[in-house]
Amino acid sequence: MPDVEFRYLLLGCLAIALLVAAFTDIRRRQIDNWLNAAIAATAPLFWWASGLALWPDVAWQLGVAAITFAALAVLFAIRAMGGGDVKLLTALALWIQPVWFMRLLVVMALIGGVLTLVLGAWHVARRQRSKLAIPYGVAISAAGLWVLASQYLPAIQSPAAQAGIG
């Protein structure tokens, strides 16, 4: 049986964890393993509080997380993405329904593109010769927070989403 209050408590904790991930990525260009592990480890509590069935709901979550990790591990191997970013997105895949996770990826790519352009321009304007490091955890966290707000805060959902259409 779903436990709405506990689910919202967990979502609040996830939101705080995403803010911490963004902050540490800006500050140190690193997302701590303990934070990613905590996000992943609390996903089963969220499944329980949401009333997800093991089959097919939890199976879908695990499948999307496995595919996410496999795809992003390739990006990590070619040094296109940091390890913390890979683990953060994989952990988020355990929390977010597959349809919403696809939306997260689109929003993340858009935010990441803007972030790259802004930081790239700043890098050029300051005439820095060092390699530009993009704190992609910011884009991941912002997209994750957008999904949480869009999916779980009825006050800001569209009428179609409230009716179960969106």
Name what the model sees in each region.
Residues 1-166:
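A membrane-topology feature that recognizes alpha-helical transmembrane segments
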